[in-house]
Amino acid sequence: MLKSKIHRATITDACIDYEGSITIDKNLMQAANLLPYEQVHVVNVNNGTRLETYVIEGSAGSGQICLNGAAARMGMKGDKIIILGYSLITEEDTLIHQPNLVYVDALNRITKVKNGVANQGLEV
């Protein structure tokens, strides 16, 4: 189940020579309930690529969102991305589960934190 989402964060750097991962500002990690080394999916809004990697904690308040290693080929500075974390939960907990959603501005400062995904009026 979706556990955490950082919505439309801006890539601040891409370091191809780093060993791998995505570095995320500690404040954003805490707001999204993401842990160091946790597996995440990253969706690049600009080019449509999707990747799977793990989180490294960046400096608190830095706004840092850095793609590292091979992941750096999937986006560039200024691209908008969505970072998704997942968890396994029991079937009974699916009835009450609400993901933690973090919204940020262009400098990756938190603008809103909420639980649950609102129905956006899309017909299925």
Curated annotation (Swiss-Prot):
Binding site for substrate: T53, G69, A70, A71
Subcellular location, principal: cytoplasm
Keywords per UniProt: Autocatalytic cleavage, Cytoplasm, Decarboxylase, Lyase, Pantothenate biosynthesis, Pyruvate, Schiff base, Zymogen
Matching Pfam families: Asp_decarbox (PF02261)
Entry keyword annotation includes Protein transport: no
Post-translational modification: Is synthesized initially as an inactive proenzyme, which is activated by self-cleavage at a specific serine bond to produce a beta-subunit with a hydroxyl group at its C-terminus and an alpha-subunit with a pyruvoyl group at its N-terminus.
Recorded GO MF terms: aspartate 1-decarboxylase activity
Family: Belongs to the PanD family.
Enzyme nomenclature, EC number: 4.1.1.11
The reaction(s) this protein catalyses: L-aspartate + H(+) = beta-alanine + CO2
Pathway: Cofactor biosynthesis; (R)-pantothenate biosynthesis; beta-alanine from L-aspartate: step 1/1
Active-site residues per Swiss-Prot or TrEMBL entry: S21, Y54
Record localization: Cytoplasm
GO biological process terms held by the UniProt record: alanine biosynthetic process; pantothenate biosynthetic process
Cofactor: pyruvate
Oligomer status and interactors: Heterooctamer of four alpha and four beta subunits.
Record-listed Pyruvic acid (Ser) modification sites: S21
The protein's name in its UniProt record: Aspartate 1-decarboxylase
Stored Gene3D superfamilies: 2.40.40.20
